[in-house]
Amino acid sequence: MIVSVKGEKEMNKLVFKQFEIGREYFLKIIEAVSKDQTDVQPDGFNNTIHWHTGHVLTITEQTMFGFPHATTHLPANYMELFGNGTKPADWTGNVPTMGELKIQLKDQLARIQQIPAEQLNNNLEKPFLGCKTFGELAGVTLMHEATHMGQIQAMKRIIEHVGVKN
């Protein structure tokens, strides 16, 4: 399939529009979570809504901006708090509040929207998660955020309607 340069640019703009729509919806969902619900870990779940929120922020920073090596927008300890394989039961030290995470999520979206659309065509230094280009990685990042959005929605419903283990 041959795509014109103009068509490619429009497709790239669409990716950034998806980030905007997805992030705004993510923020709307976490705004609807009460303070009492954010650190509850329902039966059958390894993490909390608080963790999922920080995880989305941290992994998006990692994939879109090279965190922790290429960006200093987030504290370095976010990898220990919210990186893959982490859990709230292991948290020690300074853990950001949900309010802080919400501000950082909004800031991150603004920075994502500043990425030049043509950058999505750039090849990655080495394939990551099956992705060869930055645009492919952006697509996986969008899917990742949507997956965790679903987890948060499920957890909220369970917390509201069923027993919890905390």
Predicted features and spans:
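Short, Lys/Arg-enriched N-terminal segments with co-localized hydrophobic residues
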Residues: 1-10
